[in-house]
Every structure is written in C-alpha cells, then in structure tokens.
Amino acid sequence: MDPIKHISLPVLVLFLLLSVSAGQPGTPDQRHDPYAYSGSLSPAMAVVVVVVIAALFFMGFFTVYIRHCTGAVDGSVTPAGGARRRVTNATVARGLDAETIETFPTFVYSEVKTQKIGKGALECAICLNEFEDDETLRLLPKCDHVFHPHCIGAWLQGHVTCPVCRTNLAEQTPEPEVVVETDLEAQQQSAVPVPVVELPRVKFPRSHTTGHSVVLPGESTDRFTLRVPEELRKKIMANWKLNRSNSVFVLPRGGSSRSGKQVDRSRAKSDRWLFRKTPSFLWRNRDDGSIRLGGTGSVRGNSVTSPSGDSVRADRWAFLRNPSFLWRNTTPVPSPRVEVNNKDGEGTSSVQHIGTVGSTSGSLRLPV
C-alpha cells in the first residue's frame, strides 16, 4: 500500500475526534463549578498535537526504510565482527618468511638430469613449463617436488603448504624419543629400549574449490617430483649446506693491515728519514764498527762514545749537535762515505763530516 494513505488515515480520524469534542457544549453544573474539568480543546493545541504525532510517524518510517536499504535489517552483522573476520582471514593467508624459503636447496637441472629416476621430463607445477638444462630448481625436502625459485617463492609468501601435495612446510618433524625403563635390579644390565609406535596421519579429503592446491585430485604428480638415488640426494643437501656456510664467512686477505702493500725489506734500512733539529742531530745506527761523526762523537763496537765520555748502545738513537735540516736517503747504501781501517782485529770506521747535502756519496733529496 502507498505510505501516504497510511499517514492520511490516522490524521483524518484525529481531526474528526477533535471536532466532535469541541462541538459538544458543557452542562450548566460544570459551567458554574469553578473546579469542574473542561473538555474543550483549542484549535492551536490540536494542531501542535497533530504535528508532533506526524513527526514521530515520519521518523519511524524513514528509520525502517534506511535500514532496509543498507541491508542490515536484522542487525546481526556489526562493524566490529566484520573487522575481526578480516583480521582472521589475513592471519590465515600469511605464508613462510624469506629465511625459511632460503633453507630449501637449489641446484642446476643439468646436474641431476642424467641421474634421476624416471624417463619423463620434469615440470614446474606452478607455471607448467619443462625445466631447461641451465635452469635452477628449488627442491622441497619433505616431498621432493621441484619448482622454479621465483614461482615457489611467490607461492610460499601466501601459503605454508606444498602446491602439489599440501605438505605443511612450516612444521618441524619431531624426532622419535626412546624411553628406557630401569629398576634397582637392572642397573648393572644393559638398558632395553622401548620402541615408540607412531600412527600415520590420516587426512580427510578437502574440497578443491578453495585454491589451496594447483594439482587436481587423482592427477599424476610424477612430472613434478624429482626422484634421485639416496646418495645423490645426500650430496645435494651437503653441497647446499656447504655453499650457505661459505656465503656467510669470508676469509681475510693476507698482507699488512696498515697499508695493504708489500714492503721491500732490502731498502728498509737505507730508505728512511734523517732528522736534524737544532741543537741536536738524530740518527739510528745498527751497523758494527767504530764510526766517528765529524769529531763530535764515535761509535765503537756496539757502543756510542759522546764528547763527554758517556757511552750508549749503537742500536739506539744518538742525539748530536749540528745545524738543522731534514732530508731523506733513497739509496740502498748508507749515505755517508765510510772508510774502514782494520787495526789489531778491531774494526774502526770513520765518517766524514756532512757539511752540505751535496757532499754525501748517496743521492739525497729534500721531501716535497
């Protein structure tokens, strides 16, 4: 029925009742009695009552209409429930992390092509393409199914099961425990292990309309399965673990840790700095014999004799007074000219005084 008819009918009835009550005159007793109740209603009051009733009626009508249009007539679905359902679905759709995916071994197809069991070609169950000899395969150790690394990587980001056999790849296979029963009398005897009987898991068939598997029930999965001898399988797993361990540790290179360059030890003695600082001269001598430095001091054997008469070891630094300048000796022989005179089996050497840089026998150059 038309909603306007529902609205007009009560309003007309209300107006009729108001007009009838207003047209009835009061009794004489009620007009003279000051406390008597007057049943008359003014027209303004009647209009106010009608407007209020009509407003309430329209509010209820539009409320029902809006709820009907939004599809929430029964009010059973709430926003909180919808948000909770979306969070639950997102949690269920979460797959394996990248570290777990990288633990599955990879190898080149040509390494196992001639040794695999079976004559048929291997295919990737996700892209349904045959493997080429130079392509890399990723093996799932729990079910021996092989895929392209990028194909199975994209699948495992949203799933935790194998796309062929639905094996849960996130579960860790527990090792069977051995229970040993002993008592006081059997402590000296060998323990008897009690075998643990494990019941096989029974999986009920599921509907294939949810997209949890890429292989139809009853379809042959031999072309997706890599069957190789057990020795070759162990070798593949061992090589994969070795490659992963080598990729983590890097051996340091040999050589000097300071400059990274090899040092020519033959020129280490002669190619050094000679420092002259006013009022002293600094020089280190590691040779044997007696060396006289311009009359300022001498070295005999392994000791240095200064003008004051003090002696120090020749392999230490000697400070002598001389003019100050700095040069570097680049020749493989000592820069001062040394004269050797053997007297009584004692080696004596004298060094001419170095007045200028050009007076040395070796090539001396000032540092830039």
UniProtKB/Swiss-Prot annotation:
- What SMART domains does its record include? RING (SM00184)
Which GO terms label this protein's molecular function in UniProt? ubiquitin-protein transferase activity; zinc ion binding
Q: Give the enzyme's EC designation.
A: 2.3.2.27
Q: Name one Pfam family in it.
A: zf-RING_2
- UniProtKB keywords: Membrane, Metal-binding, Phosphoprotein, Plant defense, Signal, Transferase, Transmembrane, Transmembrane helix, Ubl conjugation pathway, Zinc, Zinc-finger
Please tell me which top-level EC class this enzyme sits in.
Answer: transferase
For this protein, the record's PROSITE patterns field holds: ZF_RING_2
Q: In which broad location class does this protein mainly occur, judging by the first location in its UniProt entry?
A: membrane
Could you provide one GO biological process annotation from this protein's UniProt record? defense response to other organism
Q: How does it sit in the membrane?
A: Single-pass membrane protein
RING-type ZnF: 124-166
Where does the secretion signal sit in this chain?
Answer: 1-23
Keyword Membrane tagged: yes
Q: Where in the cell is it found?
A: Membrane
Q: Which GO terms describe its cellular component?
A: membrane
**Bias kind Polar residues: ranges:** 347-368
Reactions this protein catalyses: S-ubiquitinyl-[E2 ubiquitin-conjugating enzyme]-L-cysteine + [acceptor protein]-L-lysine = [E2 ubiquitin-conjugating enzyme]-L-cysteine + N(6)-ubiquitinyl-[acceptor protein]-L-lysine
Role according to the record: E3 ubiquitin-protein ligase that is required for the plant C/N response during seedling growth transition. May be involved in the early steps of the plant defense signaling pathway.
Record's comment describing the protein's domains: The RING-type zinc finger domain mediates binding to an E2 ubiquitin-conjugating enzyme.
Q: What is this protein called?
A: E3 ubiquitin-protein ligase ATL31
Q: Species name for this entry?
A: Arabidopsis thaliana (Mouse-ear cress)
